[in-house]
Design a protein with these regions (language model features):
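Short hydrophobic/aromatic beta-strand micro-patches
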Residues: 63-65
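Catalytic core of pol beta-like nucleotidyltransferases
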Residues: 1-35, 44, 50-56, 68-303
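Short glycine-/polar-rich loops that comprise or flank the Walker A/P-loop
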Residues: 58-60
Length: 303
């Protein structure tokens, strides 16, 4: 990856990155600006709502990029939590034209954005997400925009370098993206079905094909055999990812209002498995959610 020339990739993603503005996104932008003030550098809009542009009965996904956690938060505890295990995730609702729209936003510093999408980041949590298309709902200046683009360049290069050794020859764009995304999903506790990676690729095939083409022109390694070292790293990454996922879930209980209900909603939405939540789960999630997660894992609702 160090020998890659990613200038063409940067130029391509620069042209592709758009700033999306509508009444709903502007409402969420105002909320985040009010909360984080001058520390807010950009708001990255991503996920299924970006692809569909349908906001009702859905959960919008944002990353709030801040200059540093100490400046962004009034609470030293929240800043410490974000520094120790990024990101902190929060729930927000706005009302637009009489309709309530809900979102979750994750808070990440500029430093972590660039570090955690680089090849130095072992786990795929960040570079798997930022390798996919996103838009900006807000950026403070052109430097903030360029940093978002650089994070995507980093992520694309990193996901390639971390997964290409799983192939015994150069894959097609579809084979690469579907295989790589499936591998990153397996490294977390995810509610997505096994068809999710393929549907994400199909939803924006021209984008993924073009990015893959730019990668090949950047001088990437072309595999001739499956790398046992890469395979082993993904075994370790998957195990470590499950631990990180559990830690992030536990942390989210203190930052995410109605976090247990959101988790149940997301699992049911992606897997079709109904999740029954009662007051005990909400009041004592650390105690009563483990048996529920175990049952969901056995049903295949959580991977």
């Amino acid at each position: 990856m160090n020998n890659m020339d990613t200038r063409l990739l940067f130029q391509h993603l620069d042209k592709q990155l758009v700033t999306v503005k509508d009444d709903t996104l502007m409402a969420f932008t105002k909320v985040l600006q009010d909360r984080f003030g001058a520390s807010l550098r950009s708001i990255i809009f991503y996920g299924s709502c970006l692809r569909s542009r349908k906001y009702e009965d859905a959960m919008l996904d944002f990353y709030a990029i801040v200059d540093n956690y100490q400046r962004a938060y009034d609470s030293k505890r929240q800043a410490l939590l974000n520094s120790c295990l990024a990101p902190n995730v929060y729930f927000q609702t706005v009302e637009v034209d009489g309709v309530k729209v809900q979102a979750k936003y994750a808070v990440l510093s500029t430093k972590d954005l660039l570090l955690q999408t680089s090849a130095r980041a072992y786990h795929s949590y960040f570079w798997a997400r930022f390798a996919q298309p996103f838009a900006l709902a807000y950026h403070a200046d052109e430097q903030a925009r360029a940093q978002a683009i650089q994070a995507q360049v980093n992520s694309v290069a990193t996901i390639y370098s971390k997964t290409i050794g799983l192939f015994d020859s150069l894959p097609s764009a579809q084979e690469f993206w579907v295989g790589a995304l499936q591998k990153t999903y397996s490294a977390e506790l995810r509610a997505e079905s096994k068809l999710r990676a393929g549907s994400i690729y199909s939803s924006n095939q021209s984008h993924y094909d073009a990015v893959f083409s730019k990668l090949l022109k950047a001088g990437v390694m072309v595999p001739s055999h499956v790398s046992r070292w890469t395979v082993w790293n993904w075994v370790v990454r998957a195990a470590w990812g499950k631990v990180l996922s559990i830690l992030r879930l536990l942390k989210a209980v203190s930052t995410f209002e109605n976090g247990v209900d959101y988790l149940a909603w997301k699992i049911e939405r992606h897997s079709g498995v109904h999740v029954e939540i009662n007051d005990r789960h909400r009041k004592y999630p650390f105690l009563y959610c483990w048996p529920m997660l175990w049952r969901l894992w056995r049903k295949g609702a959580v991977q």
